[in-house]
Amino acid sequence: MRQAVRQAIEPESMRLVIPSQSGAVSPPPAGQPKPSVPPAPSGGTGKEIVVVLHEQRVYAYENGQLVHSSLASTGIARYPTRVGQFRIYVKYLATLMSGPGYYLPNVPYTMYYSGGYAIHGTYWHSNFGRPMSHGCVNLPTAEARWFYEWAPVGTLVTVRA
């Protein structure tokens, strides 16, 4: 099980970043396929993060409008990313993650949404667009920061196959 004690950020002390409507969706890096149509959010108002495992991509929606997107690396076959609907329940600027076969100090911009499953920055690989993790949603650090600053505790996280 991952350990998580470090710098917790309370929702009221977080800086909110509102992205612009133009250019907010980041293009995939060279050689990576661009999804043909972004997935629809679950509906309703407010903010939602949608993780699409077969695309290895994460989407940010606000009031049903796509505002940002990034490539990701999710769980490998042995440690799959859990599918379902969850809510971010705690955020850390940096945290220690460890388990069988890994010890990762200072994992940046970590947002836990289900037990030990989290969306976070990744400094130990840059192989985004392919499953690489022990179940978490790995993002490039700059992208993780964007999601971290945009999504408060309580944000809906939908993980789809």
Model-identified regions with their sequence ranges:
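Exported/periplasmic cell-wall-interacting domains
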Residues: G23, P28-G46, I76-Q85, Y92-A161
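General beta-strand recognition
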Residues: R57-Y59, R87, A118
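Generic alpha-helical secondary structure signal
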Residues: N63-Q65, V90, G116
